[in-house]
Amino acid sequence: MAHKKAGGSSRNGRDSAGRRLGVKKFGGQDVIGGNIIVRQRGTKVYPGVNVGMGKDHTLFATADGRVRFHDGKLGRKYVSVDMMAEAAE
């Protein structure tokens, strides 16, 4: 005979790993073309000048420059990359 009554099993106790979303390059930081600026679910931030959007809504720089976040129409947030003047050689 069993000396202990069988315990019930819990249906909780598991979780998924975080998805590492968020801003990767902040306003004022320099970027080169192809750098990821924001990883997001849906369009929390929209692409502005010199910024592209991937199929998973990731925003990335399409040119070298400096990141700038700004507000646009309809209360949307935008991120642009301002190209810097080329250094005189």
From Swiss-Prot:
**Organism, as annotated:** Sphingopyxis alaskensis (strain DSM 13593 / LMG 18877 / RB2256) (Sphingomonas alaskensis)
* Keywords carried by this UniProt record: Ribonucleoprotein, Ribosomal protein
Which domain of life does the UniProt lineage start with?
Bacteria
One annotated Gene Ontology cellular component of this protein = cytosolic large ribosomal subunit
Transmembrane segments annotated in the record for this chain? none
**GO biological process assignments:** translation
Name the chain's protein: Large ribosomal subunit protein bL27
Q: Report the InterPro entries cross-referenced here.
A: Ribosomal_bL27 (IPR001684), Ribosomal_bL27_CS (IPR018261)
